[in-house]
Amino acid sequence: MIKLRLKRYGKKREASFRLVACNSTSRRDGRPLEELGFYNPRTKETRLDTEALRTRLSQGAQPTDAVRSLLEKGGLIEKTIRPAEIEGKKKQALARQSASKKAVKEKTEESKGSEVDSETSTSAD
């Protein structure tokens, strides 16, 4: 299976990436079948060989998640929402709701506790 992935190069902490087509079992920085583009995350510079990318995609090449997002931004493929992403977003939303409910409960309990403390201190005077 042919994968479209990012091949890292550059200095330490100054990485740049080449968008390459390679065999799915090859190493990340191994020899690619074809170089299809360039991406620099620091400057957000992206260069894509659109004709070659369309050819590879029509042949059945599978892009990785990072490459898929670059291709979506470049307008080569439509933005897709996969079922796993939908489920993950639902779980995240539920987690946020439960966390906010817990925070509200803690605040109300703290305020009730401080009211009781202030009442006991005023009645003791």
From Swiss-Prot:
SUPFAM superfamilies: Ribosomal protein S16. This is Small ribosomal subunit protein bS16. Residues 103-115 have a biased composition (Basic and acidic residues). GO terms for molecular function: structural constituent of ribosome. One of its GO terms (biological process) is translation. Disulfide bonds: none annotated. Residues 87-125 are annotated as: Disordered. Pfam families: Ribosomal_S16. The lineage of its organism: Bacteria, Bacillati, Cyanobacteriota, Cyanophyceae, Synechococcales. It comes from the Bacteria. It comes from Prochlorococcus marinus (strain MIT 9211). Gene3D superfamilies: 3.30.1320.10. PANTHER family: 30S RIBOSOMAL PROTEIN S16, SMALL RIBOSOMAL SUBUNIT PROTEIN BS16M. Keywords: Ribonucleoprotein, Ribosomal protein. GO terms for cellular component: cytoplasm; small ribosomal subunit. Belongs to the bacterial ribosomal protein bS16 family.
